[in-house]
Amino acid sequence: MTTSIFTLTPGKITLSDLRDFYFGQMDVRLDDGTFEALQRAAESVERIVGRGEPVYGVNTGFGKLAKTRIPDDRLRDLQRNLVLSHAAGIGQPMPERVVRLILLLKANGLARGYSGVRPQIVQLLLDMLNQGVVPVIPEKGSVGASGDLAPLAHMSAVVIGEGEAFYQGKRLKGDEALKAAGLEPLVLGAKEGLALLNGTQASTALAIAALLDAERLFHAALITGGLTLDAARGTDAPFDPRLHELRGQKGQIECAAVYRALMQGSAIRASHLEDDERVQDPYCLRCQPQVMGACLDNLRQAARVLVIEANAVSDNPIHFPDTDEMISGGNFHAEPVAIAADLMAIAVSEVGAIAERRLALLVDAQMSGLPPFLVQDSGLNSGFMIAQVTAAALASENKTLAHPASVDSLPTSANQEDHVSMATFAARRVGDIVDNVRTIIAVEYLAAVQGLDFLAPLETSAPLLEVAKTLRKTVPFFAQDRLFTPDMEAARALIIDGALGSCVGSGVALPALEG
């Protein structure tokens, strides 16, 4: 994969930038004008410390210990102790792509110049990112206020040569990983440990990763919905633009246009335009634009919130270098991320729910008109029977996972931090839902293409035919029972890679999250 260069202008990251970074291979360079501003901010912190006034997290303890004054000669120890004590996460390491996003977002937030850190701090974060030093960040342990303390402490531990990091496939001690990459750890100055730990970058990175994966998944679900509609010999009449314009919901209008484009020129559709005794299709076919459009609108709302948060200063206290002020606030509270993640969880779960119903229709011979469970010699062969059960199990699991996390606060830090967002779990579980729905869509993909094969020599539309042919390159027709999981994994891989969206061509305008 070719590595490209991305110049980071603090506070100016777009969704397109995040998409390119997440799915591509990019080295990040800091805009040249940023270094001087960061140096001025660090000098301002020195002046504030020199005045001797108590400033939270600079010369005081943290959380409930904020009233404890720290002597000037112990300020570096204070920052180091903060990092070490707060590195209390647990669980499996976060995925590398998520950790890379965390490094990018933390560098972006600090580089805006309102956290009082030296330019060397931001540069080391970017050097770690570019050299492939990936901190080991346990997935559990943050409540999303005061920021993502435990995850970011594990990231920051590597900055000071502690903790662990992956480097070139090996899990090493933090100092060893830095040394192997030709980097050196830093000694943190006043405010710098707190600036590294405070912030919403872990929950935001998890949410953005889930969002970008969900975008590809959403496109795949639109396409498999079209495949199923044609395999079940459904009608495209409910996609008439006049219906959707009258309702006025933007996502619904766009999704209806996608279905019209997907069905254009289908010989299967043409074969039952007349003398079809069915008056209306079931909701899972007929109401696809309404359901998918609502999901699209909410994914877009989440995207707007998350791009803002990706560029946010979510530190505390926030430093205003022009006036040498430190103002304590609550920008670390990740409620916007938590609610955005909850919206995503509901939307993606619904994408899977309606897809599972389409799949159930396909395997039901009375509903679809296709062979029972989409296999010849049914009875001797069980065909897609249990694959549909797997999809149903995952759709049901998603109903529990989609329960809002943001409404489930618990007080922490001796009731000083008495309302928290649960944003990190909120975002992390969206990734679980996305993965479940990938499998549901994968089984629908397999089933719909199997159904189309039974309708030969009639062919579906040109774009849908390309999607079917892509599957058949790796998964043959299901002529008799065989191990099913390998077929599911092959279909999942195509969905993860975005292959379905690439197949349909420019004639089908798949909706982007920027809409």
Curated annotation (Swiss-Prot):
Contains an active site 4-methylidene-imidazol-5-one (MIO), which is formed autocatalytically by cyclization and dehydration of residues Ala-Ser-Gly. HAMAP family: His_ammonia_lyase (MF_00229). This is Histidine ammonia-lyase. One of its GO terms (cellular component) is cytoplasm. It is found in: Cytoplasm. The keyword Cytoplasm applies. Its EC number is 4.3.1.3. There is a cross-link at residues 145-147 (5-imidazolinone (Ala-Gly)). SUPFAM superfamilies: L-aspartase-like (SSF48557). Keywords: Cytoplasm, Histidine metabolism, Lyase. One of its GO terms (biological process) is L-histidine catabolic process to glutamate and formamide. Pathway: Amino-acid degradation; L-histidine degradation into L-glutamate; N-formimidoyl-L-glutamate from L-histidine: step 1/3. Pfam families: Lyase_aromatic. The modification 2,3-didehydroalanine (Ser) is found at residue 146. Belongs to the PAL/histidase family. GO terms for molecular function: histidine ammonia-lyase activity. It catalyses: L-histidine = trans-urocanate + NH4(+). PROSITE patterns: PAL_HISTIDASE. It comes from Gluconobacter oxydans (strain 621H) (Gluconobacter suboxydans).
